[in-house]
Amino acid sequence: QATPIKPDTSKNLHIDNIDKKLSNVLHDLFNSSKLTESAKVKIASAFFSPAGFIKISEPLTKISKVQILLGTEPNSNKGQWDKKLEENEAAFIKRQLQESIENQDKYIKKERDYFPFDQASSSSVKTMLTALKTGNIEVRRYEKNFLHAKAYLFKEDEHPENSVIIGSSNLTANGLSANLELNVSNHDPEVIKETEQWFDRLWDESVPFNLASYFEEIFTPRDPFVIFLKVLWELYGEEVLEEYIQDKKLPLTDFQKHGVERALRL
């Protein structure tokens, strides 16, 4: 039997992705689990990306209970948040939240669409989908307010490395390994207990989030003609776009404009 990996969290550590990468610390921490029924992981993150999740997904699929709580953040476009004359404060915040939720959905889809299409990446996504569908990984989104917190909690009965890591890193590839971040791990049982209570309270107020549905589309069979058009666009898209910009100076009928726009959306 292989010797369990001892995670580098034996004391309170600063994790900044320079000397230590959070993805490596979390990977080793989750891999150190004895895989008992008491093992649990709870993650809160304002942002999410598939590339970030896959960095730590392999050990997560083995843990009996994993909860991921996603939040939303206000759009950086300040002009978008101008309060309308007819809005009271509650309506204004509600609109902000709704638009941020929609922006997050678009962001996840964009990250998915730009995810590398190779054998290793496809295998990782399939592993993630299996975990999401079998039920040991559950995802919810907090939609009552903007959730900006980032926390990674691991807990298991009689495990020497129970800990919570709190800081600035989102559950994204950059947050876990590339950006200059600052996170601190803490092993104080009271801190872990209070953080878990905080998490559970928000979890109970959150709504289920079908993360699997975003990635199932990757493996949906595609029309060969659409794939052919995609290949053409990758090869000649820039030239076509330049010609399109030039042609926009010429008058087009409505149906011609509609046809061009549809072609670009493909």
Describe these PLM feature segments.
Residues 1-261:
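PLD/PLD-like phosphodiesterase catalytic module centered on the HKD motif
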Residues 262-266:
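Phosphate-binding P-loop
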